[in-house]
Amino acid sequence: MYIEKIKSPTELKQLNIEALKVVADETRQAVLNRVSKHGGHVGPNLGFVEATVALHYVFDTPKDKLVFDVSHQSYPHKVLTGRASGFLGNVDEMNAISGYSSPTECPEYDNFEVGHTSTSVSLATGLQKARDIKGTKENIIAVIGDGSLSGGEAFEGLDEASELGTGIIIVVNDNEMSIAEPHGGIYKNLRDLRESNGQCNHNWFKAWGFEYKYLEEGNDVEKLIEVFRSVKDTNKPTVVHIHTEKGHGFSPAVENKEAWHYGMPFNKEDGSRPERPTTESYEQLLSDWLLKEMKQDKTLVAVTAGTPSAAGFTPEKRKEAGAQHVDVGIAEEQAVAMISGMAKGGLRPVWTVFSTFIQRTYDQIAQDLCINANPAVINVTWGGTASMNDITHICLFDIPMLCSIPGLIYLAPTTCEEYFSMLRWAILQDKKPIAIRIPSNGVHHTTENVDTEYAYEAKYKVTQKGEKVAIIAAGSFYQKGENVVRLLAEKGIKATLINPRYLNEVDRETLDSLKGSHKLVVTLEDGSKDGGFGERIAAYYGTSEIKVLVGGIKKDLYDRFDLQQLLSDNRLLDEQIVEDVIDILS
């Protein structure tokens, strides 16, 4: 097997075309081996195998610089740069390899940590400018595809690459897909270019000042080598547009490209997946609820940004929603400004977004939404410790971010019933933008009545009255708060338990009511505590006699963390919290 022996891409240059085709086949099988056992991005990587072999054959990496957008296509690159053991080896060897570009893992060949979309061209222009100033001669190659061209930063990067006017190669990996179907006018032009074999008159890339090459056979190693050779050492901004097949070589991924964009472990022989217990999910509950409400309210519009799965909108549900579902492509900034405009125009927009991606929208939320006080709704999902754990995808920063923006209410429901009650109120009210942090610790139900109306000022809910100690447990950490209260009761301490519901500001009345009867307040939040919910409460009590123990995650860039270890390191295991409470009281 070639790939077991290849330690660097330079070894590919000794092989003939037939051997390179074997390398491509072996690489595809290695990728399949990893994702079938470990999970990961399936379709995007399988479709870019031949292109990766050709890129490393033609160009002289690591002198020549490769930048992969979003890293969804970087697995074959890892196989060919000395990391095949992470695809062929045991579980520990697989765990050692990130699912994304990682200079920590391989500084020689991975130039950047990349996991969010539309950044490759911008990053590459920085390398381009550095090369030009230093007077060196290396090729700079950015790889972009899988819907990333719908993101605003991709446009900004292309604009700058054209402005610089020196050699840069942008490989547009056109597999006709994003995560789901692509959205945006650029994809109409890509379709026209495909259908005309790159010859149509209205060429978006040429209009921006790029040299342009088109290759229909984007999964043909020999033809890829030919087109890459033709642009090597160019001194002009150049686009190489290759038409590939997402999931190439694995029929289940070809037949259902959206479902196989990313996959958990599966049987690589037939694509079957292990049966898992059927459990409720907020994605399914939300999409069903929205579709039902849409039938009664034609002004209700569900918005997604390239990830319709965040709101549970399968292809069938997107079809059912029709014009009442809008996917803006991988363009979160556009989503925020658009929902503000929708609300201004009399619609009731609900945008659902993964916590890790809302980080891209700070300015739009502050400027376009909150200053204008337009009553749009933002669902923030997968926020917290129990979500994604790669360094580029950690979901710990939405609370400090959103709570720093004036004019935005950020709600944290603790149960399914409370969530949908908050959602209904947020949709029907017409005064302010409302964000809601969907619980990330599973779907919990309550038989108790939940409020149907919510104030625009924070109003906490005391769910159990006690003394000496008050536990204020927000959102998906509320059940942790219940556990802590129970454990304290076993030690003779009857604690007060509070569901704060509001993350963006403190409820002064409730906090003042604790003075005199309580010595300690413990705050629990499922995210970064620096600048978060608990620190606001600590600041409020600053001049009082009440002590505050702020429970949350220390600010850091965590990578592939173990959940229980992360909680333990931050003194957030139930027993640790109880120990700390007793120590402080004593």
PLM features: what roles do these ranges have?
Residues 29-36, 96-113, 135-141, 314-328, ...:
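Glycine/charged-rich beta-loop-alpha catalytic/anionic-binding loops adjacent to active sites
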Residues 41-164, 300, 305, 314-315:
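Cofactor-binding active-site loop characterized by glycine-rich and histidine/acidic residues
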Residues 110-267, 272-279, 283-288, 408-518:
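Glycine-rich ThDP/TPP pyrophosphate-binding loop and its adjacent helix/strand module
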Residues 265, 273-278, 387-389, 409, ...:
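Peripheral docking tails and interdomain loops at the edges
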Residues 1-34, 252-268:
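Cofactor-/ligand-binding subdomain signature composed of acidic, glycine-rich
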Residues 70-75, 144-151, 172-178, 218-219, ...:
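Acidic, glycine-rich active-site loops and adjacent beta-strand->loop/helix elements
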Residues 64, 250-359, 364-374, 473-475:
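Non-catalytic terminal/interface segments that mediate subunit docking, oligomerization
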Residues 87-97, 163-177, 370-382:
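A glycine-rich helix N-cap at a beta->alpha junction
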